[in-house]
Design a protein with these regions (language model features):
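Macrodomain-like recognition of ADP-ribose-binding/processing modules
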Residues: 1-179
Length: 179
């Protein structure tokens, strides 16, 4: 695990399973517009949470790229799930702004909900095709900027799929000055 302090917020980068983030108040779902089970992160979160999650999500859909909504966590070890629709790279524009909106809005929603810890996947880097290097810079830059405004959130973790993804994020940390 890689850890950096940004003011009062601890930023963590780790390889793991987004559905197994024990002791985190919320996990972020890289959702589809209909907030339904699918592949990747959304499928894993819905499988772990159970059918109650899809039932709660149904009236909240659809959401647009860059938007987030909050639900209960059901069978997950987390009380809350923050669902964000990331941009499809090359289709939803401006992609960097929409991706930054996901991270920023999720942190604001968590903070307003009184949550102290949030675990994110690398939003839009799977089926939505966002290049991991570019997505890492947007994610880490946005989290760094947002950290100063957070009152309740004290720990932000990005849960990555592979050691290579961790390397990409570590390089992005250096690029934004968080060595």
């Amino acid at each position: 695990m890689i850890e950096r302090r940004i003011g009062d917020v601890v930023l963590q980068l780790d390889v793991g399973d987004i559905t197994q983030q024990i002791d985190f108040d919320a996990v972020v779902n890289a959702a589809n517009a209909q907030l339904q089970p699918g592949g990747g992160v959304a499928g894993a979160i819905h499988r772990a949470a159970g059918p109650g999650l899809a039932k709660e999500c149904a009236p909240l859909a659809p959401i647009s790229p860059g938007e987030c909504v909050v639900t209960d966590g059901y069978g997950l070890p987390n009380p809350r799930v923050i669902h964000c629709l990331g941009p499809v790279y090359g289709s939803d524009e401006p992609a960097a702004v929409l991706l930054a909106d996901c991270y920023r809005k999720a942190l604001v929603l968590a903070d307003e909900d009184g949550l102290t810890s949030v675990a994110f996947p690398a939003i839009s880097t799977g089926a939505f095709g966002y290049p991991p290097e570019k997505a890492a810079r947007v994610a880490l830059g946005t989290i760094t900027e947002a950290a100063a405004e957070l009152g309740n959130v004290k720990v932000v973790r990005i849960v990555l799929y592979s050691a290579r993804d961790l390397e990409v994020h570590e390089e992005a940390l250096a690029e934004i000055g968080l060595r």
